[in-house]
Amino acid sequence: MNKCYLKYLLQSWTPRYSIRSNTRNFLQEILSFNEPQNLTESNWKRWLQCFNRYNLPLQMWYKISPQQWKSQVSKHWKDRNHFSKNSHRKNQSLLLYKQKEFYSIFASDSSSRYTREIERLNKRYRCNLFLYSYLDHTKSLNMRRFPVWRSEERETILNNRIKEIRNFHLFNNERNNENSINSLGKEKNLFFRSNLVLWLVPEFLGKKNIHKTEFIPVFYPSLVRERGEKTIQNRKSLRERERHESIRQWRWESKDLEERFKELGDMASVMTFIQNKKNIISLSVKMREDLDLFRLLFRRDIGLNRLTINSEHRLPRVLDDEILMCKIITTLLKFKSRFQERLDFNIFDESISRIRKFESERKTISKSFSLEEILLPKRCKELRILNSLYSKYDINEEAKFDEGSLGKNRGSNEKLVRINEEFNTNVNQSIKRFLWPSYRLEDLACMNRFWFNTSNGSRFSMLRIRLYLLIHD
């Protein structure tokens, strides 16, 4: 069908126009109309937009925009020439690799495995970066400014980086090989293999490091004596720390014996102050009745073990450990100096965009959602300690704004207050998910082990005491 006739047909189409039945059915199938309708040129163009457009050849593009076409073609050939030069250089370097039997982690045989490993680390880094930005309130919130977040096309940065590292590694090895060949040409014969010298001529082994300086160790008896004294002192201190002496506490077997011995002690103390002989005689008569207790106490067959019970117990010497106390104090000082800026930070300034990421489609926050389920183990410890610090401050005091900032951030502040109200709807569930088992004594005591990367053995093993009990609905 000719385009001119088709255009004329579309302009003069009317329902009263007589047309053959086969043509009418054909148009009805194409246009999906039960009956012929009025069609215009704009409707026809709109229908044609559903199909793929025709790609013009390069000759047509050269006539339409010659400057752009010329720049694209020149860029294409430059890239191609650059790629050919790099490929030639790579082939030469690979030949040298095969001759010298070098190995690289970025070689072609192992590139796929290391590429997957780097991609996995990159993915974890992005997740860690996003989650750490939620915790760190002092940094900028614009996560899109990082190259990884700008667009999906920038995902190729990692692959390009691997190629650059590989090219740099190959180029350096090629340059080192050239330098080694030049040095061999000046000093030795090129056709002489130096790796055969060590096992063909054993005399060369002693002449390998002729000009190397040798240090003769000097024996100092005083240093040996000091080291021996230090080891002895360390062993003594270790024995004293490991020795848990029990405290002996004697308890009378019966209350009657305890009362009788108490009366004897009171009478003996009173007799030292009495000067009247009659009173002394009367007291001595009363004491004779209970003197048999002393005989029983000092008899071998009965003695102290029969009249009393030993209720000794071992007391842990946790708080007597000077190393433990020193580590606790240094950890708290580091903690205070490191997070002083975070304590002074206003929580209403830059937390809107972070909370917005955890909103659902209905603008509500799920009650069963916990940040600890998506954080890394190290970041979980940071979240717990930061929450323990922020919980000490009143939100109403932090919500005081200036008049200028209140007018600018009125909408965002209202939204944050509404979100906080949604969080506090179910108090029992929030206590279960955040207070326990998040805040425990071993987390605050062992934060130097996870946060400051310092270890103190198993000294905190006895401090695992839960501050909060189990809470049931």
Swiss-Prot record:
Species this chain originates from: Anthoceros angustus
Primary location: plastid
The protein's name in its UniProt record: Putative protein TIC 214 C-terminal part
Transmembrane segments: none
Entry function: Involved in protein precursor import into chloroplasts. May be part of an intermediate translocation complex acting as a protein-conducting channel at the inner envelope.
Keywords from the named record: Chloroplast, Plastid, Protein transport, Transport
Family named by the database record: Belongs to the TIC214 family.
Cellular compartment(s): Plastid, Chloroplast
Keyword flag Zinc: no
GO BP: any one term: protein transport
Phylogenetic lineage: Eukaryota, Viridiplantae, Streptophyta, Embryophyta, Anthocerotophyta
A GO cellular-component term linked to this record: chloroplast
Top-level division of the source organism's lineage: Eukaryota
Complexes and interactors: Part of the Tic complex.
